Amino acid sequence: MRGTTARYASVTSENKLSFGFPYKGGNATLTLRRRPEDGLNIILEVKGQFLCSSFRNDRVAVKFDDGPIQRFGCSEPSDARTGELFINGENRFVAKLKKARTVIIEAEFYQEGRRQMQFDVAGLDWK
């Protein structure tokens, strides 16, 4: 209707997370999304409850291949869904991601502590 195009690239985690009731856990999904209305977004999703707020200046730890651990700010979706978070510093993240084969993201979850999600990104097609 608007004549615009959104672009997506997603990858599922190699490992599964297990959480207590009522959350199911399972594989996480890392999605890169570019839309005309809000630009580039990095979205991490799992059936759990992330603890990440831009108001508290929360961060996720990210490791690209065997490189050093890096910190990226994170924020919650505007609709307050707890099973999703947005990773800030999108351009820096994508620049590192394009050169990597493996990415490990560590985030904090409500009553579950910090958990790591590993992604094989060697075949991720993002332009």
Regions found by a protein language model. Give the residues of each.
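A generic "folded-domain core" signal
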Residues: M1-K127
